[in-house]
């Protein structure tokens, strides 16, 4: 009885706490990586802006103050697309950034009803990325819908600018599509850095291990008590890629190098983002900048209407 009471007290204290996860730990990143994270998060945010997926050959613009580093760069898109004719409505762009010497591939997060239906397609399906690798059916289908458009655009850009790095980024659903793009571009011999923000789990352990061990760099960024990295559930056979770069800072606060925990592993129970017992969708919306700022009013209403669903739908 004493042990049961003690357990209940500990559990109650954890539930009432909104300040710290269960296992605090710190490991700072360097200033260069922090600046790269800021740039990549802004490229991910820019993918939500309509003018960045219907006007190829133009400078990337956000118009809402959420991507100043991107707007200040000497850059232009070479491919913009919105696959509205597909069930997944996958959307994004490929751009050349001459200021940062990088070829950018960015995927938009959930912004339409079709995107949300993609999120809810939880079945694991076989992939052609690696032997025995299974992935979330909806996320992988989104990549398949974009693959034949994105891949040749990236290859052409690399041929034209061989000294430039290739980086793939995305937030939320975009962060779920990005690992497949990075993995298959790497399979074609390209050195690709992968940056995701608030990504859900995307596949089984074989896929996670394969992507985590590919060369190029994997940076899976999570924030505070964001609920999206917690789904789909582990019991459904899903795990994350490694490592996790956890931002241990509340929403809309200035983030420094020392605010990160770098956690190796594909499960990370009771560590980083997974340490939280209570979650908040607001933590999903803030990764160095407000990620959804460019959504138009109709799309915002669609997303808000669905946010009353169970947390598994909130990405």
Predicted feature residues:
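Cleavable N-terminal signal peptides of Sec/SRP-targeted secreted and luminal proteins
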Residues: 2-19
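Flexible, membrane-associating and regulatory peripheral segments of lipid-active enzymes
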Residues: 17-113, 304-313
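A conserved cap/lid and substrate-binding interface adjacent to the catalytic center
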Residues: 69-169, 186-192, 215-216
């Amino acid at each position: 009885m004493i042990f049961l009471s003690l357990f209940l007290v500990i559990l109650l204290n954890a539930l009432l706490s909104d300040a710290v996860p269960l296992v605090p730990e710190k490991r700072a990143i360097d200033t260069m990586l922090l600046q790269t994270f800021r740039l990549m998060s802004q490229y991910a945010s820019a993918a939500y802006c309509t003018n960045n997926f219907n006007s190829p050959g133009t400078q990337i613009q956000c118009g809402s103050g959420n991507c100043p580093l991107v707007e200040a760069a000497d850059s232009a898109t070479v491919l913009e697309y919105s696959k509205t004719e597909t069930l997944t409505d996958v959307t994004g762009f490929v751009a050349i950034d001459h200021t940062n010497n990088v070829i950018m591939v960015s995927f938009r997060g959930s912004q339409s009803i079709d995107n949300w239906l993609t999120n809810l397609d939880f079945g694991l399906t076989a992939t052609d990325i690696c032997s025995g690798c299974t992935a979330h059916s909806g996320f992988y289908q989104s990549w398949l819908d974009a693959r034949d458009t994105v891949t040749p655009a990236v290859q052409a850009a690399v041929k034209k600018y061989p000294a430039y790095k290739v980086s793939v980024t995305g937030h939320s659903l975009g962060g779920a599509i990005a690992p497949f793009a990075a993995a298959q571009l790497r399979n074609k011999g390209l050195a690709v850095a992968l940056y995701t923000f608030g990504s859900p789990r995307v596949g089984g352990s074989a896929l996670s291990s394969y992507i985590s061990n590919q060369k190029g760099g994997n940076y899976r960024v999570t924030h505070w008590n964001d609920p999206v990295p917690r789904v789909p559930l582990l019991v459904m056979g899903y795990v994350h890629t490694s490592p996790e770069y956890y931002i241990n800072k509340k929403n809309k606060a200035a983030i420094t190098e020392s605010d990160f925990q770098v956690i190796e592993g594909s499960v990370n129970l009771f560590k980083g983002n997974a340490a939280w017992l209570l979650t908040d969708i607001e933590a999903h919306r803030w990764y160095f900048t407000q990620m959804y700022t460019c959504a138009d009013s109709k799309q915002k209403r669609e997303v808000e209407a669905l946010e009353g669903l169970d947390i598994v739908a909130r990405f």
